[in-house]
Protein backbone atom coordinates (compact mmCIF):
# COMPACT_ATOMS: atom_id res chain seq x y z
CA UNK A 1 0.00 0.00 0.00
CA UNK A 2 1.06 3.56 -0.68
CA UNK A 3 0.61 6.16 2.07
CA UNK A 4 0.44 9.78 0.97
CA UNK A 5 0.53 12.73 3.37
CA UNK A 6 -0.63 16.21 2.41
CA UNK A 7 0.70 18.45 5.18
CA UNK A 8 -0.16 22.11 5.54
CA UNK A 9 -0.34 24.75 8.20
CA UNK A 10 -3.65 23.55 9.64
CA UNK A 11 -4.05 19.87 8.77
CA UNK A 12 -2.18 16.62 8.21
CA UNK A 13 -4.12 14.50 5.71
CA UNK A 14 -3.27 10.86 5.04
CA UNK A 15 -4.55 8.90 2.07
CA UNK A 16 -3.90 5.18 1.57
CA UNK A 17 -3.79 3.97 -2.04
CA UNK A 18 -3.64 0.44 -3.40
CA UNK A 19 -1.51 -0.87 -6.27
CA UNK A 20 -4.21 0.25 -8.70
CA UNK A 21 -3.79 3.83 -7.41
CA UNK A 22 -7.25 3.83 -5.85
CA UNK A 23 -7.93 5.58 -2.54
CA UNK A 24 -8.83 3.04 0.15
CA UNK A 25 -8.85 5.15 3.31
CA UNK A 26 -8.12 8.66 4.50
CA UNK A 27 -7.90 10.54 7.76
CA UNK A 28 -7.09 14.09 8.82
CA UNK A 29 -5.75 15.52 12.05
CA UNK A 30 -4.74 19.07 13.04
CA UNK A 31 -1.12 20.07 12.38
CA UNK A 32 0.78 20.68 15.64
CA UNK A 33 2.28 24.15 15.40
CA UNK A 34 4.57 24.48 18.40
CA UNK A 35 6.14 21.07 19.09
CA UNK A 36 8.30 19.08 16.69
CA UNK A 37 7.88 15.95 18.82
CA UNK A 38 4.09 16.35 18.66
CA UNK A 39 4.36 16.78 14.89
CA UNK A 40 6.40 13.58 14.50
CA UNK A 41 4.00 11.74 16.80
CA UNK A 42 0.99 12.82 14.72
CA UNK A 43 2.52 11.46 11.51
CA UNK A 44 3.78 8.25 13.10
CA UNK A 45 0.45 7.53 14.78
CA UNK A 46 -1.36 7.83 11.46
CA UNK A 47 1.14 5.48 9.82
CA UNK A 48 0.73 2.97 12.67
CA UNK A 49 -3.05 3.13 12.31
CA UNK A 50 -2.82 2.53 8.57
CA UNK A 51 -0.35 -0.35 9.01
CA UNK A 52 -2.72 -2.01 11.47
CA UNK A 53 -5.81 -1.38 9.36
CA UNK A 54 -4.28 -2.87 6.19
CA UNK A 55 -1.97 -5.43 7.75
CA UNK A 56 1.12 -4.23 5.96
CA UNK A 57 4.07 -1.85 6.15
CA UNK A 58 3.10 0.76 3.59
CA UNK A 59 5.46 3.12 1.82
CA UNK A 60 5.33 6.74 3.01
CA UNK A 61 5.45 9.87 0.87
CA UNK A 62 4.89 13.41 2.11
CA UNK A 63 3.96 16.58 0.27
CA UNK A 64 4.62 19.80 2.15
CA UNK A 65 4.82 23.49 1.19
CA UNK A 66 8.35 24.84 0.95
CA UNK A 67 11.73 23.25 0.36
CA UNK A 68 11.59 19.62 1.53
CA UNK A 69 15.31 19.20 2.12
CA UNK A 70 17.93 21.95 2.15
CA UNK A 71 21.65 21.30 1.76
CA UNK A 72 22.01 20.45 5.46
CA UNK A 73 19.12 17.97 5.30
CA UNK A 74 16.54 20.15 7.05
CA UNK A 75 13.08 21.19 5.95
CA UNK A 76 12.23 24.79 5.10
CA UNK A 77 8.47 25.33 5.43
CA UNK A 78 7.32 28.66 6.84
CA UNK A 79 3.71 27.48 7.08
CA UNK A 80 4.68 24.44 9.17
CA UNK A 81 6.73 26.04 11.96
CA UNK A 82 6.87 22.95 14.18
CA UNK A 83 8.91 21.07 11.56
CA UNK A 84 10.69 23.86 9.69
CA UNK A 85 14.44 23.75 10.23
CA UNK A 86 14.30 20.10 11.32
CA UNK A 87 15.67 16.98 9.56
CA UNK A 88 12.14 15.73 8.93
CA UNK A 89 12.85 13.08 6.30
CA UNK A 90 15.70 11.51 8.27
CA UNK A 91 13.79 11.58 11.56
CA UNK A 92 10.65 10.01 10.11
CA UNK A 93 12.63 7.40 8.17
CA UNK A 94 14.32 6.36 11.42
CA UNK A 95 11.16 6.31 13.52
CA UNK A 96 9.09 4.48 10.92
CA UNK A 97 11.90 2.14 9.82
CA UNK A 98 11.24 2.75 6.12
CA UNK A 99 12.26 5.08 3.32
CA UNK A 100 10.20 8.27 3.72
CA UNK A 101 10.13 10.54 0.67
CA UNK A 102 9.37 14.26 0.71
CA UNK A 103 8.54 16.71 -2.03
CA UNK A 104 6.84 20.06 -2.19
CA UNK A 105 3.09 20.22 -2.53
CA UNK A 106 3.12 21.66 -6.05
CA UNK A 107 5.21 18.75 -7.34
CA UNK A 108 2.81 16.36 -5.63
CA UNK A 109 -0.11 18.03 -7.40
CA UNK A 110 1.62 17.56 -10.76
CA UNK A 111 2.60 13.97 -9.95
CA UNK A 112 -0.96 13.10 -9.00
CA UNK A 113 -2.23 14.33 -12.35
CA UNK A 114 0.57 12.67 -14.32
CA UNK A 115 -0.50 9.33 -12.85
CA UNK A 116 -4.13 9.77 -13.89
CA UNK A 117 -5.12 6.72 -15.94
CA UNK A 118 -5.57 8.77 -19.11
CA UNK A 119 -2.52 10.99 -18.64
CA UNK A 120 0.11 8.28 -18.09
CA UNK A 121 0.59 8.17 -21.88
CA UNK A 122 2.39 11.54 -21.76
CA UNK A 123 6.15 11.48 -20.97
CA UNK A 124 6.42 15.12 -19.86
CA UNK A 125 3.58 16.59 -17.82
CA UNK A 126 3.52 20.14 -16.53
CA UNK A 127 1.27 21.06 -13.62
CA UNK A 128 0.27 24.73 -13.45
CA UNK A 129 -1.45 26.06 -10.34
CA UNK A 130 -3.47 29.27 -10.68
CA UNK A 131 -4.59 29.78 -7.11
CA UNK A 132 -3.59 32.08 -4.27
CA UNK A 133 -0.24 32.18 -6.06
CA UNK A 134 1.12 30.66 -9.26
CA UNK A 135 3.27 27.55 -9.19
CA UNK A 136 3.47 24.03 -10.46
CA UNK A 137 5.72 21.11 -11.19
CA UNK A 138 7.24 19.01 -13.95
CA UNK A 139 6.90 15.24 -14.17
CA UNK A 140 9.06 13.22 -16.56
CA UNK A 141 8.31 9.53 -17.04
CA UNK A 142 6.32 9.44 -13.82
CA UNK A 143 8.91 11.13 -11.60
CA UNK A 144 9.12 14.76 -10.45
CA UNK A 145 11.94 16.99 -11.60
CA UNK A 146 12.92 18.83 -8.44
CA UNK A 147 16.16 20.62 -9.22
CA UNK A 148 19.01 21.29 -6.82
CA UNK A 149 16.99 23.62 -4.59
CA UNK A 150 13.48 22.18 -5.12
CA UNK A 151 12.44 25.32 -7.04
CA UNK A 152 11.73 23.69 -10.41
CA UNK A 153 8.18 24.72 -11.25
CA UNK A 154 8.20 28.04 -9.40
CA UNK A 155 6.69 29.54 -12.52
CA UNK A 156 5.05 32.37 -10.62
CA UNK A 157 8.39 34.01 -9.95
CA UNK A 158 9.30 34.46 -13.58
CA UNK A 159 9.07 38.17 -14.48
CA UNK A 160 6.64 39.64 -16.97
CA UNK A 161 8.06 39.14 -20.48
CA UNK A 162 8.55 42.08 -22.81
CA UNK A 163 5.57 41.01 -24.93
CA UNK A 164 3.36 41.38 -21.87
CA UNK A 165 4.59 44.92 -21.28
CA UNK A 166 4.05 45.75 -24.94
CA UNK A 167 0.49 44.46 -24.67
CA UNK A 168 -0.35 46.00 -21.28
CA UNK A 169 1.61 49.23 -21.78
CA UNK A 170 5.16 50.13 -20.84
CA UNK A 171 3.83 52.09 -17.84
CA UNK A 172 2.11 48.95 -16.50
CA UNK A 173 2.89 48.64 -12.75
CA UNK A 174 5.62 46.16 -11.83
CA UNK A 175 4.17 45.05 -8.52
CA UNK A 176 6.44 44.07 -5.66
CA UNK A 177 6.21 40.35 -4.92
CA UNK A 178 6.47 38.62 -1.58
CA UNK A 179 9.75 37.10 -2.80
CA UNK A 180 11.26 40.60 -2.88
CA UNK A 181 11.36 40.99 -6.67
CA UNK A 182 9.17 43.16 -8.91
CA UNK A 183 6.99 42.04 -11.80
CA UNK A 184 6.62 38.35 -10.89
CA UNK A 185 3.82 36.90 -12.98
CA UNK A 186 1.93 35.44 -10.02
CA UNK A 187 0.98 38.99 -9.02
CA UNK A 188 -1.08 39.19 -12.22
CA UNK A 189 -2.09 35.60 -13.02
CA UNK A 190 -3.07 34.22 -9.60
CA UNK A 191 -6.60 34.53 -8.25
CA UNK A 192 -5.54 37.66 -6.42
CA UNK A 193 -3.84 38.95 -9.56
CA UNK A 194 -7.01 38.32 -11.57
CA UNK A 195 -8.89 40.57 -9.12
CA UNK A 196 -6.08 43.16 -9.03
CA UNK A 197 -6.11 43.50 -12.82
CA UNK A 198 -9.83 44.17 -12.73
CA UNK A 199 -9.45 46.84 -10.07
CA UNK A 200 -6.48 48.39 -11.90
CA UNK A 201 -8.46 48.91 -15.10
CA UNK A 202 -11.99 49.44 -13.77
CA UNK A 203 -11.40 50.84 -10.26
CA UNK A 204 -13.79 48.36 -8.65
CA UNK A 205 -12.53 46.07 -5.84
CA UNK A 206 -14.23 42.81 -6.81
CA UNK A 207 -13.02 39.30 -6.01
CA UNK A 208 -12.43 36.68 -8.69
CA UNK A 209 -15.74 34.79 -8.13
CA UNK A 210 -17.69 38.06 -8.43
CA UNK A 211 -15.94 38.95 -11.69
CA UNK A 212 -16.53 35.48 -13.11
CA UNK A 213 -20.23 35.70 -12.17
CA UNK A 214 -20.46 38.98 -14.10
CA UNK A 215 -18.68 37.32 -17.04
CA UNK A 216 -21.21 34.49 -17.03
CA UNK A 217 -24.03 37.09 -17.07
CA UNK A 218 -22.57 38.67 -20.20
CA UNK A 219 -21.24 41.83 -18.56
CA UNK A 220 -19.13 43.61 -21.20
CA UNK A 221 -16.58 44.94 -18.72
CA UNK A 222 -16.03 41.51 -17.17
CA UNK A 223 -15.73 39.94 -20.61
CA UNK A 224 -13.14 42.50 -21.69
CA UNK A 225 -11.25 41.80 -18.48
CA UNK A 226 -11.22 38.03 -19.08
CA UNK A 227 -9.98 38.59 -22.64
CA UNK A 228 -7.12 40.70 -21.29
CA UNK A 229 -6.30 38.14 -18.58
CA UNK A 230 -6.26 35.24 -21.05
CA UNK A 231 -4.02 37.17 -23.43
CA UNK A 232 -1.61 37.90 -20.58
CA UNK A 233 -1.69 34.26 -19.44
CA UNK A 234 -0.95 33.11 -22.99
CA UNK A 235 2.04 35.47 -23.29
CA UNK A 236 3.54 34.28 -20.01
CA UNK A 237 2.75 30.61 -20.59
CA UNK A 238 4.24 30.83 -24.07
CA UNK A 239 7.62 31.66 -22.54
CA UNK A 240 7.37 28.72 -20.15
CA UNK A 241 6.31 26.29 -22.88
CA UNK A 242 9.23 27.36 -25.07
CA UNK A 243 11.57 26.28 -22.27
CA UNK A 244 9.74 23.16 -21.08
CA UNK A 245 7.92 21.88 -24.21
CA UNK A 246 5.58 19.51 -22.31
CA UNK A 247 3.20 16.98 -23.81
CA UNK A 248 0.42 17.94 -21.41
CA UNK A 249 -0.39 20.93 -19.19
CA UNK A 250 -2.77 20.30 -16.29
CA UNK A 251 -4.19 23.42 -14.65
CA UNK A 252 -5.18 23.42 -10.98
CA UNK A 253 -5.97 25.99 -8.30
CA UNK A 254 -9.11 28.05 -7.83
CA UNK A 255 -9.06 29.64 -11.29
CA UNK A 256 -9.03 26.20 -12.92
CA UNK A 257 -12.73 26.05 -12.03
CA UNK A 258 -13.35 28.84 -14.56
CA UNK A 259 -14.07 26.95 -17.82
CA UNK A 260 -12.96 29.80 -20.10
CA UNK A 261 -9.33 29.24 -19.15
CA UNK A 262 -8.97 25.70 -20.43
CA UNK A 263 -11.47 26.29 -23.25
CA UNK A 264 -9.83 29.39 -24.73
CA UNK A 265 -6.17 29.26 -23.77
CA UNK A 266 -4.89 26.85 -26.43
CA UNK A 267 -6.07 29.02 -29.34
CA UNK A 268 -4.09 32.00 -28.00
CA UNK A 269 -0.78 30.21 -27.58
CA UNK A 270 0.57 29.69 -31.14
CA UNK A 271 1.43 33.36 -31.67
CA UNK A 272 3.68 33.20 -28.58
CA UNK A 273 5.52 30.00 -29.54
CA UNK A 274 8.19 29.12 -32.07
CA UNK A 275 6.71 28.33 -35.50
CA UNK A 276 7.69 24.66 -35.21
CA UNK A 277 6.21 24.26 -31.72
CA UNK A 278 3.04 22.30 -31.14
CA UNK A 279 0.56 23.47 -28.53
CA UNK A 280 0.36 20.83 -25.78
CA UNK A 281 -2.86 19.32 -24.61
CA UNK A 282 -4.36 21.51 -21.88
CA UNK A 283 -6.67 20.03 -19.26
CA UNK A 284 -8.21 20.98 -15.95
CA UNK A 285 -6.92 19.01 -12.94
CA UNK A 286 -9.01 15.94 -12.21
CA UNK A 287 -8.23 14.98 -8.65
CA UNK A 288 -9.11 18.07 -6.62
CA UNK A 289 -8.46 18.03 -2.89
CA UNK A 290 -7.13 14.46 -3.03
CA UNK A 291 -4.32 15.46 -5.39
CA UNK A 292 -1.82 16.29 -2.67
CA UNK A 293 -2.23 12.92 -0.97
CA UNK A 294 -2.20 11.06 -4.30
CA UNK A 295 0.97 12.73 -5.49
CA UNK A 296 2.76 12.16 -2.20
CA UNK A 297 1.80 8.48 -2.20
CA UNK A 298 3.02 8.10 -5.77
CA UNK A 299 6.53 9.32 -4.92
CA UNK A 300 7.20 5.60 -4.46
CA UNK A 301 5.64 4.40 -7.71
CA UNK A 302 8.80 4.56 -9.83
CA UNK A 303 12.28 3.69 -8.56
Swiss-Prot record:
Protein name: N-acetyl-D-glucosamine kinase
Biological role: Catalyzes the phosphorylation of N-acetyl-D-glucosamine (GlcNAc) derived from cell-wall degradation, yielding GlcNAc-6-P.
Binding site for Zn(2+): 157, 177, 179, 184
Binding-site list for ATP: 4-11, 133-140
Catalyzed reactions per annotation: N-acetyl-D-glucosamine + ATP = N-acetyl-D-glucosamine 6-phosphate + ADP + H(+)
Cross-referenced Gene3D superfamilies: 3.30.420.40
Family label: Belongs to the ROK (NagC/XylR) family. NagK subfamily.
GO biological process terms held by the UniProt record: N-acetylglucosamine metabolic process; peptidoglycan turnover
Enzyme Commission number, as recorded: 2.7.1.59
Biochemical pathway: Cell wall biogenesis; peptidoglycan recycling
Keywords recorded for this protein, A-Z: ATP-binding, Carbohydrate metabolism, Kinase, Metal-binding, Nucleotide-binding, Transferase, Zinc
Molecular function in Gene Ontology: ATP binding; N-acetylglucosamine kinase activity; zinc ion binding
